[in-house]
Amino acid sequence: MTSNNSLLGRGRMSYSSTAPPRFKRSVDQRDTFSDNFDYDKDSSNRGRTYIAASNSTTGVPPPNNSRSGCTNNTNNTNNTSNTSNTNNNDSVDENTVFETLPYYLPCFSWLPEYTFNKLWGDVIAGISVASFQIPLALSYTTSIAHVPPLCGLYSLAISPFVYGILGSVPQMIVGPESAISLVVGQAVESITLHKENVSLIDISTVITFVSGTILLFSGISRFGFLGNVLSKALLRGFISSVGLVMIINSLISELKLDKFLVSLPQHYHTPFEKILFLIDYAPAQYHIPTAIFSGCCLIVLFLTRLLKRKLMKYHKSAIFFPDILLVVIVTILISMKFNLKHRYGISIIGDFSMDNFDELKNPLTRPRRKLIPDLFSASLIVAMLGFFESTTASKSLGTTYNLTVSSNRELVALGFMNIVISLFGALPAFGGYGRSKINALSGAQSVMSGVFMGVITLITMNLLLQFVHYIPNCVLSVITTIIGISLLEEVPGDIKFHLRCGGFSELFVFAVTFCTTIFYSIEAGICIGCVYSIINIIKHSAKSRIQILARVAGTSNFTNLDDYMMNMKRNSLDVEGTEEIEGCMIVRIPEPLTFTNSEDLKQRLDRIERYGSSKIHPGRKSLRSKDSIKYVIFDLGGMTSIDSSAAQVLEEIITSYKRRNVFIYLVNVSINDKVRRRLFKAGVAASVERAQANNNENNTSNTFSDAGETYSPYFDSIDAALYEIEKMKIKGNNVPNNDSESFMSNTLFNSSLV
């Protein structure tokens, strides 16, 4: 048979009996083609006989089995290669440790290149970040987490040292976070309500230790991909609800109603219940001096922030103005000068004992181990939120500063960091995008900026705690309110975006997460949001996306018939723009086949046979008979992988077609050897029609031999399969190839007859 290069000028052929040109390669060149060729060591000459792994789809002709003319060169090359490998083994082994060490300890990637200029930039950035992070840490600790102030300060001081060794994002600033502190605060309220003698430091220690352990094992197990599970809409819904909860809780302290709330016989736990409490009791029970002082601080912070935003348009350095630190310093001076606590009854932080912080905490003592069952759910929420928040920050910084960030390494760093700081009784610490961005804008060059922030925090803890004594509690609550408002600022923009884009599923996730958090609890909100997201992922992966193809009239192009017809109708154009081949159904599988979507493939194929489309409702009356289908072409160009369960389903589908005397053709099959080997072992390759291949190719999982001829079960193109169909019609062959039928398919078929 003579070779043909096209089908009516439109397609390539794969059944030429003329052998393609051969070429010679040295042994060194073999590795280049290791993904495309297998070799058989059991040949008669004990050499390496290469076997083509594709039917000319790679565009590389298979090499000649003969070694004439190049045997000596091959042997010499082998000897040279073996000698060089032997000599280089020692040097490679010696350098391996130094090459891989920066991957596991990222500090070794920047320490050798650290200079004085970078040091100066990190010092300035560390001072800038510490100026507002220390007041925030005190605010999170006292007004949100309800634990001693030193828990927050230790979290801010110690965590940067650990992250400086294991962290891989240079500008990342780690420390206590608002949402995390709120989860801890709700856990504290729940535990202390039933166990009055429990130490608040023990609660903080256990939550930090357990969450760190979860993160560490997740990183070791390489679960970093889970950072892609939760959608941005879910996180936005949760963070916005956290912002509202922070405002509600802070308002209680700003009106000095916290003690009155505790004294009531009924309990107000959920944010919605606290809103009802404020409506019922705030008008009559609020403390006037505290409310006035809180209002003044709130107005000052609002005005300074508005001024900063306007100035930043002209002077970017305005972002470094320490408005929060300025308000804290001024209120400390006012509190000291006018004796706010005794003269006006405004509560201050007051004296707090450092006795419980003079030694390291063991998270696994018996009293603390007993707290683990009660605090495990809160610890899991902390680990999840902390990881997602840190991942968001690291990805944003990585995009901005062209960094490659490994989620698994970040998990290990965050996990080990929290295990270490739990020994100090600290709050959980994670990365935050806002402060990390300010750190980068301040001139930070490495993680040493966070270390300097930690040093300044330690200095504050040892020298300036006497001034912390005078900070009014309501001022810290006002700072929390400002942070809560900032968490809500992006919500309107996100809602408008999803409404404009028709993202109603994202809006539903947002609403469910937000409402559940407000009306029930933070844990319930994040759990329901996660469950809904996972269900959506499963639904998405279980849906088959097969396409029915048709040729565009007057061209050699094939297109998705459903989309093409819909587009033609939408644009009021002539819908007679495609050509259907009589008795032939062309189906494209544009995705990997797995156990999740292979079952749906059966149903959609049945719908296509009955209606000519996969988008018509299955309850409608069939538009055509299944007997009209005589040929089915599967375009597997997008099927880059297939698991054994899906291969079994595909084999059953092909077997069912064979019983109806339908001819099956596979085209554009991936050159991936795993895909082809699995199709062969599942019996799929043996059950489909074949194209005549190179006579010199050996019988492998990709070829079959019959009467001296070699055949391949895979066609290069749809046109090649159509050409073969035309040849069969001319010959009058009406019996499809049926060499192989799986035992499982026979068993299932026969069992249905019993």
From Swiss-Prot:
Positions of the STAS domain: 574-725
Basic and acidic residues biased stretches: 25-45
Biased composition (Low complexity): 65-89
Any one Gene Ontology molecular-function term assigned to this protein's record: secondary active sulfate transmembrane transporter activity
GO cellular component terms, A-Z: endoplasmic reticulum; endoplasmic reticulum membrane; plasma membrane
Annotated membrane topology: Multi-pass membrane protein
InterPro entries given in the database record: S04_transporter_CS, SLC26A/SulP_dom, SLC26A/SulP_fam, STAS_dom, STAS_dom_sf
Transmembrane stretches, start-end: 119-139, 147-167, 173-193, 200-220, 233-253, 283-303, 318-338, 371-391, 411-431, 451-471, 475-495, 518-538
Pfam families: STAS, Sulfate_transp
Cytoplasmic-side positions: 1-118, 168-172, 221-232, 304-317, 392-410, 472-474, 539-754
Keyword line: Endoplasmic reticulum, Membrane, Transmembrane, Transmembrane helix, Transport
Subcellular location: Endoplasmic reticulum membrane
Span list, region Disordered: 1-91
Residues on Lumenal side: 140-146, 194-199, 254-282, 339-370, 432-450, 496-517
Family classification: Belongs to the SLC26A/SulP transporter (TC 2.A.53) family.
Physiological role: Possible sulfate transporter.
Official protein name in the record: Putative sulfate transporter YPR003C
